[in-house]
Amino acid sequence: MATVVLLLGSASLMSVPVAQADPGPGSPVPADDPFYDWDGGLDVSPGTVLRSRPMTFRTPTQPTPITGSQVLYKTTDQQGDGVVTVATVLRPLVPGPTRIVSYHMAYDALGSQCNPSYTLSGGSTSPIAGAEQAVIAGYLAAGYTVVVPDYEGEELEWTIGRQSGYAALDGIRAAQSLLQLPSSTPVGMVGYSGGSVPTQWGAEIAPEYAPELNLVGVAAGGLPVDLAHNLPYVSGNKQWAGVIPALIVAYERAYGLDLNSFVSDYGLEVIDQVDQECIAQFADDYPTLTDASMVKAPYNSLLDVPEVVAAIDDNIMGSQGTPRTPMFLAVGHADPTGDTIMITGDVQGLAYAYCGRGVDVQYAQYDGLTHSEAFPVFEAQSLQFLTERFAGGPTHSNCVTIPPGNALTPTS
Protein backbone atom coordinates (compact mmCIF):
# COMPACT_ATOMS: atom_id res chain seq x y z
CA MET A 1 0.00 0.00 0.00
CA ALA A 2 2.86 2.40 0.74
CA THR A 3 4.08 2.12 -2.87
CA VAL A 4 0.61 2.85 -4.16
CA VAL A 5 0.20 5.86 -1.91
CA LEU A 6 3.38 7.48 -3.21
CA LEU A 7 1.91 7.45 -6.71
CA LEU A 8 -1.26 9.25 -5.77
CA GLY A 9 -2.02 12.90 -5.48
CA SER A 10 -4.64 15.41 -4.55
CA ALA A 11 -8.01 16.03 -6.09
CA SER A 12 -8.80 19.46 -7.40
CA LEU A 13 -11.69 21.22 -5.72
CA MET A 14 -13.88 23.02 -8.22
CA SER A 15 -16.34 25.85 -8.00
CA VAL A 16 -19.13 24.05 -6.16
CA PRO A 17 -19.51 25.68 -2.71
CA VAL A 18 -17.87 23.78 0.12
CA ALA A 19 -20.34 23.02 2.89
CA GLN A 20 -18.06 22.09 5.77
CA ALA A 21 -14.67 20.78 6.80
CA ASP A 22 -13.06 17.48 5.94
CA PRO A 23 -14.96 14.67 7.72
CA GLY A 24 -12.28 12.59 9.42
CA PRO A 25 -12.41 9.77 11.98
CA GLY A 26 -14.83 10.60 14.75
CA SER A 27 -17.24 12.35 12.42
CA PRO A 28 -20.92 11.51 12.89
CA VAL A 29 -22.37 8.70 10.81
CA PRO A 30 -24.20 9.90 7.70
CA ALA A 31 -27.60 9.51 9.35
CA ASP A 32 -26.51 12.14 11.91
CA ASP A 33 -24.37 14.33 9.64
CA PRO A 34 -26.06 17.52 8.34
CA PHE A 35 -24.02 17.32 5.14
CA TYR A 36 -26.22 14.43 3.97
CA ASP A 37 -29.51 16.26 4.62
CA TRP A 38 -31.12 18.37 1.92
CA ASP A 39 -34.19 20.43 2.70
CA GLY A 40 -34.01 22.59 -0.42
CA GLY A 41 -35.79 22.07 -3.70
CA LEU A 42 -35.02 19.32 -6.17
CA ASP A 43 -36.30 21.04 -9.30
CA VAL A 44 -32.94 20.43 -10.98
CA SER A 45 -31.58 17.81 -13.34
CA PRO A 46 -30.41 14.43 -12.01
CA GLY A 47 -26.71 14.57 -11.27
CA THR A 48 -26.80 18.21 -10.18
CA VAL A 49 -24.32 18.87 -7.35
CA LEU A 50 -26.12 20.42 -4.38
CA ARG A 51 -23.12 20.80 -2.09
CA SER A 52 -19.59 19.48 -1.70
CA ARG A 53 -16.82 19.25 0.86
CA PRO A 54 -13.19 18.12 0.84
CA MET A 55 -12.20 14.75 2.22
CA THR A 56 -9.04 12.73 2.80
CA PHE A 57 -8.89 9.14 1.59
CA ARG A 58 -8.11 6.89 4.55
CA THR A 59 -7.33 3.18 4.46
CA PRO A 60 -8.14 0.83 7.37
CA THR A 61 -4.58 1.20 8.68
CA GLN A 62 -3.55 4.75 7.86
CA PRO A 63 -4.53 8.09 6.34
CA THR A 64 -3.08 8.82 2.91
CA PRO A 65 -2.05 12.05 1.17
CA ILE A 66 -4.91 11.55 -1.27
CA THR A 67 -7.58 14.21 -1.02
CA GLY A 68 -10.83 14.41 -2.89
CA SER A 69 -14.39 15.60 -2.57
CA GLN A 70 -17.70 14.35 -1.31
CA VAL A 71 -20.65 15.60 -3.36
CA LEU A 72 -24.33 15.61 -2.43
CA TYR A 73 -26.32 15.35 -5.65
CA LYS A 74 -29.79 14.76 -6.98
CA THR A 75 -30.72 11.31 -8.23
CA THR A 76 -33.86 9.19 -8.68
CA ASP A 77 -35.38 6.46 -6.52
CA GLN A 78 -37.03 3.19 -7.53
CA GLN A 79 -40.42 4.88 -7.87
CA GLY A 80 -39.06 7.64 -10.11
CA ASP A 81 -39.03 10.39 -7.49
CA GLY A 82 -36.19 12.86 -6.95
CA VAL A 83 -33.93 12.08 -3.98
CA VAL A 84 -30.36 12.83 -2.92
CA THR A 85 -27.28 10.79 -2.17
CA VAL A 86 -23.52 11.28 -1.86
CA ALA A 87 -20.54 10.23 -3.96
CA THR A 88 -16.82 10.38 -3.25
CA VAL A 89 -14.65 11.75 -6.07
CA LEU A 90 -10.91 10.95 -6.02
CA ARG A 91 -8.30 12.22 -8.50
CA PRO A 92 -4.86 10.76 -9.29
CA LEU A 93 -1.54 12.54 -9.55
CA VAL A 94 -0.56 10.52 -12.62
CA PRO A 95 -0.67 12.87 -15.62
CA GLY A 96 -2.76 12.11 -18.66
CA PRO A 97 -6.25 12.43 -20.06
CA THR A 98 -9.08 12.00 -17.58
CA ARG A 99 -10.69 8.56 -17.47
CA ILE A 100 -13.40 7.90 -14.91
CA VAL A 101 -13.98 4.60 -13.11
CA SER A 102 -17.23 4.44 -11.18
CA TYR A 103 -16.34 1.90 -8.50
CA HIS A 104 -19.25 0.36 -6.63
CA MET A 105 -18.34 -1.01 -3.22
CA ALA A 106 -20.18 -4.06 -1.88
CA TYR A 107 -21.24 -2.31 1.29
CA ASP A 108 -24.50 -4.26 1.58
CA ALA A 109 -25.84 -2.01 4.31
CA LEU A 110 -29.00 -1.36 6.26
CA GLY A 111 -27.22 1.24 8.43
CA SER A 112 -25.44 4.37 7.22
CA GLN A 113 -22.24 3.57 9.14
CA CYS A 114 -21.21 1.39 6.19
CA ASN A 115 -21.78 4.01 3.47
CA PRO A 116 -18.71 4.22 1.20
CA SER A 117 -18.42 7.97 1.77
CA TYR A 118 -18.10 7.32 5.51
CA THR A 119 -15.74 4.37 5.09
CA LEU A 120 -13.40 6.09 2.63
CA SER A 121 -12.98 9.08 4.95
CA GLY A 122 -12.01 6.86 7.88
CA GLY A 123 -15.36 6.59 9.62
CA SER A 124 -15.58 2.80 9.69
CA THR A 125 -14.08 -0.26 8.11
CA SER A 126 -14.44 -4.00 7.63
CA PRO A 127 -12.37 -6.70 5.91
CA ILE A 128 -14.57 -6.35 2.81
CA ALA A 129 -14.22 -2.57 2.73
CA GLY A 130 -10.49 -2.78 3.33
CA ALA A 131 -10.02 -5.05 0.33
CA GLU A 132 -12.03 -2.71 -1.86
CA GLN A 133 -10.13 0.35 -0.63
CA ALA A 134 -6.97 -1.37 -1.86
CA VAL A 135 -8.60 -1.92 -5.26
CA ILE A 136 -9.62 1.75 -5.42
CA ALA A 137 -6.04 2.75 -4.59
CA GLY A 138 -4.89 0.58 -7.47
CA TYR A 139 -7.15 2.38 -9.94
CA LEU A 140 -5.90 5.73 -8.68
CA ALA A 141 -2.29 4.59 -9.04
CA ALA A 142 -3.05 3.61 -12.64
CA GLY A 143 -4.17 7.16 -13.36
CA TYR A 144 -7.94 6.84 -13.17
CA THR A 145 -10.31 9.32 -11.58
CA VAL A 146 -12.48 7.22 -9.25
CA VAL A 147 -16.09 7.95 -8.31
CA VAL A 148 -17.61 5.91 -5.46
CA PRO A 149 -21.35 6.49 -4.95
CA ASP A 150 -23.49 5.74 -1.90
CA TYR A 151 -25.82 4.02 -4.34
CA GLU A 152 -28.26 2.57 -1.79
CA GLY A 153 -29.44 6.11 -1.10
CA GLU A 154 -30.51 7.78 2.11
CA GLU A 155 -32.86 4.96 3.09
CA LEU A 156 -30.27 2.20 2.60
CA GLU A 157 -32.33 0.22 0.09
CA TRP A 158 -30.02 -2.72 -0.55
CA THR A 159 -30.27 -4.70 -3.86
CA ILE A 160 -32.86 -2.32 -5.32
CA GLY A 161 -31.98 -2.23 -9.01
CA ARG A 162 -33.08 0.85 -10.90
CA GLN A 163 -32.43 3.14 -7.94
CA SER A 164 -28.88 1.82 -7.57
CA GLY A 165 -28.26 2.29 -11.28
CA TYR A 166 -29.65 5.82 -11.24
CA ALA A 167 -27.41 6.73 -8.30
CA ALA A 168 -24.34 5.36 -10.09
CA LEU A 169 -25.05 7.21 -13.34
CA ASP A 170 -25.93 10.44 -11.54
CA GLY A 171 -22.76 10.12 -9.46
CA ILE A 172 -20.78 10.13 -12.71
CA ARG A 173 -22.70 13.19 -13.88
CA ALA A 174 -22.00 14.91 -10.56
CA ALA A 175 -18.28 14.12 -10.80
CA GLN A 176 -18.13 15.50 -14.32
CA SER A 177 -19.84 18.67 -13.13
CA LEU A 178 -17.57 19.02 -10.10
CA LEU A 179 -14.43 18.55 -12.18
CA GLN A 180 -15.75 20.55 -15.14
CA LEU A 181 -15.41 17.62 -17.52
CA PRO A 182 -17.37 17.11 -20.73
CA SER A 183 -19.92 14.29 -20.96
CA SER A 184 -17.68 12.75 -23.64
CA THR A 185 -15.15 11.83 -20.92
CA PRO A 186 -14.67 8.04 -21.12
CA VAL A 187 -16.23 6.13 -18.23
CA GLY A 188 -16.01 2.55 -16.99
CA MET A 189 -18.08 0.95 -14.22
CA VAL A 190 -17.12 -1.95 -11.99
CA GLY A 191 -18.63 -3.75 -9.01
CA TYR A 192 -18.68 -7.15 -7.34
CA SER A 193 -21.42 -8.83 -5.30
CA GLY A 194 -23.66 -6.06 -3.91
CA GLY A 195 -21.60 -3.65 -6.01
CA SER A 196 -22.69 -5.50 -9.15
CA VAL A 197 -26.23 -4.16 -8.64
CA PRO A 198 -25.54 -0.50 -9.55
CA THR A 199 -23.00 -1.70 -12.12
CA GLN A 200 -25.29 -3.99 -14.10
CA TRP A 201 -28.39 -1.84 -13.65
CA GLY A 202 -26.43 1.26 -14.56
CA ALA A 203 -25.36 -0.34 -17.83
CA GLU A 204 -28.89 -1.57 -18.51
CA ILE A 205 -30.69 1.75 -17.98
CA ALA A 206 -27.98 4.11 -19.26
CA PRO A 207 -29.22 4.17 -22.89
CA GLU A 208 -32.51 5.71 -21.73
CA TYR A 209 -31.55 7.47 -18.49
CA ALA A 210 -28.08 8.84 -19.25
CA PRO A 211 -27.45 8.48 -23.00
CA GLU A 212 -24.91 11.31 -23.00
CA LEU A 213 -22.41 9.38 -20.87
CA ASN A 214 -19.54 7.78 -22.77
CA LEU A 215 -19.54 4.31 -21.20
CA VAL A 216 -16.66 2.35 -22.69
CA GLY A 217 -16.97 -0.81 -20.59
CA VAL A 218 -18.74 -2.35 -17.61
CA ALA A 219 -17.49 -5.17 -15.35
CA ALA A 220 -19.86 -6.91 -12.91
CA GLY A 221 -19.12 -10.02 -10.88
CA GLY A 222 -20.98 -12.22 -8.40
CA LEU A 223 -24.35 -10.88 -9.52
CA PRO A 224 -27.69 -11.45 -7.71
CA VAL A 225 -29.58 -11.77 -10.99
CA ASP A 226 -32.93 -13.10 -9.73
CA LEU A 227 -33.33 -13.31 -5.97
CA ALA A 228 -36.21 -15.75 -6.29
CA HIS A 229 -33.46 -18.26 -7.08
CA ASN A 230 -31.07 -17.10 -4.35
CA LEU A 231 -33.57 -17.34 -1.47
CA PRO A 232 -33.86 -21.16 -1.46
CA TYR A 233 -30.11 -21.45 -2.05
CA VAL A 234 -29.18 -19.52 1.10
CA SER A 235 -32.05 -20.80 3.28
CA GLY A 236 -30.45 -22.61 6.22
CA ASN A 237 -26.96 -21.74 4.94
CA LYS A 238 -24.79 -21.03 7.99
CA GLN A 239 -22.68 -18.49 6.09
CA TRP A 240 -25.39 -16.50 4.28
CA ALA A 241 -28.85 -17.12 5.80
CA GLY A 242 -28.82 -13.70 7.47
CA VAL A 243 -29.26 -12.02 4.10
CA ILE A 244 -32.90 -13.20 4.04
CA PRO A 245 -34.25 -10.87 6.78
CA ALA A 246 -32.00 -8.10 5.46
CA LEU A 247 -33.62 -8.37 2.04
CA ILE A 248 -37.05 -8.04 3.62
CA VAL A 249 -35.93 -4.85 5.37
CA ALA A 250 -34.76 -3.47 2.01
CA TYR A 251 -38.02 -4.39 0.28
CA GLU A 252 -40.07 -2.84 3.08
CA ARG A 253 -38.14 0.41 2.67
CA ALA A 254 -38.40 0.48 -1.12
CA TYR A 255 -41.93 -0.85 -1.58
CA GLY A 256 -43.69 -0.20 1.72
CA LEU A 257 -44.47 -3.85 2.47
CA ASP A 258 -46.78 -4.57 5.40
CA LEU A 259 -44.50 -6.93 7.32
CA ASN A 260 -47.10 -7.81 9.94
CA SER A 261 -49.26 -9.39 7.26
CA PHE A 262 -46.83 -12.18 6.41
CA VAL A 263 -43.74 -12.21 8.70
CA SER A 264 -43.65 -14.61 11.66
CA ASP A 265 -42.95 -13.47 15.22
CA TYR A 266 -39.46 -14.92 14.89
CA GLY A 267 -39.02 -13.14 11.57
CA LEU A 268 -40.05 -9.80 13.06
CA GLU A 269 -37.57 -10.31 15.90
CA VAL A 270 -34.71 -11.00 13.48
CA ILE A 271 -35.70 -8.10 11.23
CA ASP A 272 -35.54 -5.79 14.23
CA GLN A 273 -32.03 -7.07 15.00
CA VAL A 274 -30.61 -6.57 11.49
CA ASP A 275 -32.45 -3.30 10.74
CA GLN A 276 -29.37 -1.06 11.13
CA GLU A 277 -26.61 -3.59 10.47
CA CYS A 278 -24.34 -4.32 7.51
CA ILE A 279 -23.54 -7.63 5.88
CA ALA A 280 -20.45 -8.31 8.00
CA GLN A 281 -22.76 -8.35 11.03
CA PHE A 282 -25.87 -10.11 9.73
CA ALA A 283 -24.77 -12.60 7.03
CA ASP A 284 -23.65 -15.46 9.28
CA ASP A 285 -25.42 -14.56 12.54
CA TYR A 286 -28.41 -16.83 11.88
CA PRO A 287 -27.07 -20.23 10.76
CA THR A 288 -30.37 -22.06 11.29
CA LEU A 289 -32.62 -19.40 9.76
CA THR A 290 -34.72 -20.62 6.85
CA ASP A 291 -37.04 -19.04 4.36
CA ALA A 292 -39.96 -20.90 5.95
CA SER A 293 -39.11 -19.64 9.46
CA MET A 294 -39.56 -16.04 8.31
CA VAL A 295 -43.25 -16.36 7.41
CA LYS A 296 -46.49 -17.21 9.17
CA ALA A 297 -49.60 -19.08 8.03
CA PRO A 298 -50.96 -19.35 5.44
CA TYR A 299 -47.53 -18.90 3.87
CA ASN A 300 -44.77 -21.51 3.74
CA SER A 301 -42.18 -19.37 1.96
CA LEU A 302 -41.48 -15.75 1.18
CA LEU A 303 -42.03 -16.77 -2.42
CA ASP A 304 -45.67 -17.46 -1.52
CA VAL A 305 -46.18 -13.79 -0.61
CA PRO A 306 -47.40 -11.80 -3.64
CA GLU A 307 -45.91 -8.50 -2.45
CA VAL A 308 -42.47 -10.05 -1.95
CA VAL A 309 -42.59 -11.78 -5.33
CA ALA A 310 -43.59 -8.51 -7.01
CA ALA A 311 -40.61 -6.76 -5.41
CA ILE A 312 -38.22 -9.51 -6.51
CA ASP A 313 -39.62 -9.51 -10.05
CA ASP A 314 -39.12 -5.74 -10.26
CA ASN A 315 -35.40 -6.30 -9.71
CA ILE A 316 -34.59 -9.15 -12.12
CA MET A 317 -31.47 -8.17 -14.01
CA GLY A 318 -31.79 -7.98 -17.77
CA SER A 319 -35.51 -7.26 -17.59
CA GLN A 320 -35.71 -3.54 -18.25
CA GLY A 321 -33.14 -2.56 -20.83
CA THR A 322 -30.15 -3.54 -22.93
CA PRO A 323 -26.62 -2.20 -22.42
CA ARG A 324 -24.88 -0.49 -25.31
CA THR A 325 -21.37 -1.04 -24.02
CA PRO A 326 -19.09 -4.09 -23.80
CA MET A 327 -19.77 -6.13 -20.67
CA PHE A 328 -17.58 -8.38 -18.54
CA LEU A 329 -19.71 -10.70 -16.40
CA ALA A 330 -18.23 -13.22 -13.96
CA VAL A 331 -19.22 -15.62 -11.19
CA GLY A 332 -17.71 -18.33 -9.01
CA HIS A 333 -18.87 -21.94 -9.17
CA ALA A 334 -18.11 -23.81 -5.96
CA ASP A 335 -20.94 -26.35 -6.00
CA PRO A 336 -23.53 -27.58 -8.50
CA THR A 337 -25.67 -24.45 -7.94
CA GLY A 338 -23.31 -21.53 -7.54
CA ASP A 339 -20.63 -19.80 -5.50
CA THR A 340 -22.41 -20.43 -2.13
CA ILE A 341 -24.70 -17.38 -2.50
CA MET A 342 -24.96 -16.40 -6.19
CA ILE A 343 -26.42 -18.70 -8.84
CA THR A 344 -23.99 -19.61 -11.62
CA GLY A 345 -26.80 -20.49 -14.04
CA ASP A 346 -28.42 -17.08 -13.47
CA VAL A 347 -25.26 -15.20 -14.46
CA GLN A 348 -24.90 -17.50 -17.47
CA GLY A 349 -28.52 -16.77 -18.36
CA LEU A 350 -27.98 -13.01 -18.13
CA ALA A 351 -24.85 -13.17 -20.28
CA TYR A 352 -26.59 -15.42 -22.82
CA ALA A 353 -29.62 -13.11 -22.98
CA TYR A 354 -27.43 -10.06 -23.52
CA CYS A 355 -25.54 -11.86 -26.28
CA GLY A 356 -28.85 -12.59 -27.97
CA ARG A 357 -29.60 -8.86 -27.98
CA GLY A 358 -26.29 -7.98 -29.59
CA VAL A 359 -24.31 -6.97 -26.50
CA ASP A 360 -20.57 -7.66 -26.63
CA VAL A 361 -20.17 -9.95 -23.60
CA GLN A 362 -17.08 -11.53 -22.08
CA TYR A 363 -18.13 -14.18 -19.54
CA ALA A 364 -15.84 -15.74 -16.92
CA GLN A 365 -16.70 -18.64 -14.63
CA TYR A 366 -14.39 -19.43 -11.74
CA ASP A 367 -14.84 -23.15 -11.20
CA GLY A 368 -14.06 -24.29 -7.67
CA LEU A 369 -14.15 -20.79 -6.18
CA THR A 370 -16.64 -19.52 -3.62
CA HIS A 371 -18.12 -16.03 -3.68
CA SER A 372 -15.37 -14.62 -1.47
CA GLU A 373 -12.58 -16.50 -3.24
CA ALA A 374 -13.68 -15.24 -6.66
CA PHE A 375 -13.43 -11.58 -5.63
CA PRO A 376 -9.67 -11.00 -6.18
CA VAL A 377 -9.70 -12.93 -9.46
CA PHE A 378 -12.59 -10.85 -10.72
CA GLU A 379 -10.96 -7.59 -9.68
CA ALA A 380 -7.74 -8.44 -11.53
CA GLN A 381 -9.62 -9.38 -14.70
CA SER A 382 -11.82 -6.29 -14.42
CA LEU A 383 -8.78 -4.01 -14.33
CA GLN A 384 -7.43 -5.69 -17.46
CA PHE A 385 -10.84 -5.50 -19.16
CA LEU A 386 -11.29 -1.80 -18.40
CA THR A 387 -7.70 -0.96 -19.32
CA GLU A 388 -8.32 -2.46 -22.76
CA ARG A 389 -11.66 -0.68 -23.11
CA PHE A 390 -10.17 2.72 -22.27
CA ALA A 391 -7.34 2.06 -24.72
CA GLY A 392 -9.82 1.25 -27.49
CA GLY A 393 -8.44 -2.26 -27.92
CA PRO A 394 -10.34 -5.22 -29.36
CA THR A 395 -12.98 -6.90 -27.25
CA HIS A 396 -12.91 -10.60 -26.38
CA SER A 397 -16.52 -11.68 -26.60
CA ASN A 398 -17.10 -15.37 -25.97
CA CYS A 399 -20.84 -15.32 -26.66
CA VAL A 400 -20.62 -18.44 -28.83
CA THR A 401 -19.49 -20.56 -25.86
CA ILE A 402 -21.74 -19.18 -23.10
CA PRO A 403 -24.31 -21.76 -21.92
CA PRO A 404 -27.99 -20.71 -21.98
CA GLY A 405 -28.10 -20.90 -18.18
CA ASN A 406 -31.33 -20.30 -16.29
CA ALA A 407 -34.41 -18.61 -17.66
CA LEU A 408 -34.85 -15.20 -16.07
CA THR A 409 -38.62 -15.06 -16.11
CA PRO A 410 -40.71 -13.41 -13.39
CA THR A 411 -42.12 -15.69 -10.71
CA SER A 412 -45.52 -14.01 -10.70
Give the residues covered by each predicted segment:
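Secretory targeting and sorting signals
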Residues: 1-21
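Catalytic-loop region of hydrolases
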Residues: 19-96, 355, 410-412
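Accessory cap/linker subdomain of secreted extracellular hydrolases
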Residues: 25-33, 39-40, 224-320, 341
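Short beta-strand element of the alpha/beta-hydrolase
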Residues: 86-91, 97-121, 137, 218
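Alpha/beta-hydrolase active-site loop
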Residues: 131-135, 158-180
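Primarily recognizes the serine-hydrolase "nucleophile elbow" in alpha/beta-hydrolase
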Residues: 173-241
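Short beta-strand/loop motif that positions the catalytic acidic residue
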Residues: 323, 328-335
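Catalytic active-site module of serine/aspartate enzymes centered on a nucleophile-bearing elbow/loop
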Residues: 364-367, 376-412
